[in-house]
């Protein structure tokens, strides 16, 4: 396998840098490729797109591997960003990083890798793969549970996983930084990127308002009484506390308010008081657009655990697969702030089974 040509997605961050280094050290024929998915040079608070490219180039030069750039901005706009806007317009809260992995990193990029004559792609995700007895590949959580990224990778199928390597999946994040420092990689102390890939660290509200006209409306309490005004339903997520702008409501205790529901028909945001208000909790959800890593669901009904957001602790649940492919999920314990548009991802211990979009 050591003669195989591996194309590493190099982002200019420490995780992909160390992934490329480890593969080179293991004797593979490695090429680093930087994917540019967004045209505007979005100078964020700590690093511009040009800086990411420069860091990626420096890492490849340091390791001694070829460096290439590929522009997927058109594909990203058509297959990720327009869907992102459509979802927000509909009052849902999408996760573009999941769609980016599905449409760009493990689809458009994979096709490009084939053009380069690559045998495998590699990324700096904290995840692992495992080939089981029947020859199929499982998607397994990364060793560093606090950094596990299988939540973002649940749309990957067998064909993609058979051609993918996750070199740092078996390593703790702290060790990844040590390896980068020991090998004098410029990214060793670079801050982890947060936020949506095309927004960087900019204020989300400012960014979204450039693309979608906001429609202001009223904020009501659970009894339908007006308690404030909102700037546009798309700016709010279920369970959100910050930025509601509700304060000093007459005859109400000084307890924080949280976004609980969106009444799209009437353009009303419903807010409730208290982090643990019953309206913020549900023990059931329905999901559509299911992706199963193995190619199909484990059974028509099964027990497993699930996450309704990244970094949430796995929650025990029962899953029922409907005739149309959607699923009904019943949790053993009520879950806070289940959010339409986000993904629910299913696990059997450390094995990621797949997931879908919450409606």
UniProtKB/Swiss-Prot annotation:
* Transmembrane stretches, start-end: none
* EC identifiers of the protein: 2.8.1.13
* Binding locations of ATP: 9-16, 35, 124
Per the record, which residues fall in region Interaction with tRNA? 147-149, 309-310
| Active-site residue numbers | 100, 197
- Catalysed transformations (reactions): S-sulfanyl-L-cysteinyl-[protein] + uridine(34) in tRNA + AH2 + ATP = 2-thiouridine(34) in tRNA + L-cysteinyl-[protein] + A + AMP + diphosphate + H(+)
Q: Provide the disulphide bond pattern.
A: 100-197
GO MF entries: ATP binding; tRNA binding; tRNA-uridine 2-sulfurtransferase activity
Segments for region (Interaction with target base in tRNA) = 95-97
Q: Does the keyword tRNA-binding apply?
A: yes
Q: Which residues of this protein are annotated with the site description Interaction with tRNA?
A: 125, 342
**GO biological process terms, semicolon-separated:** tRNA wobble position uridine thiolation
Any Pfam family hit: tRNA_Me_trans
Q: Which UniProt keywords apply?
A: ATP-binding, Cytoplasm, Disulfide bond, Nucleotide-binding, RNA-binding, Transferase, tRNA processing, tRNA-binding
Where it mainly occurs, coarsely classed, is cytoplasm
Report the locations given in the UniProt record. Cytoplasm
- Give the top-level enzyme category: transferase
Cellular compartments per GO CC: cytoplasm
Q: What does this protein do?
A: Catalyzes the 2-thiolation of uridine at the wobble position (U34) of tRNA, leading to the formation of s(2)U34.
The entry assigns this protein to a family as follows: Belongs to the MnmA/TRMU family.
Under what name is this protein listed? tRNA-specific 2-thiouridylase MnmA
| Species | Francisella philomiragia subsp. philomiragia (strain ATCC 25017 / CCUG 19701 / FSC 153 / O#319-036)
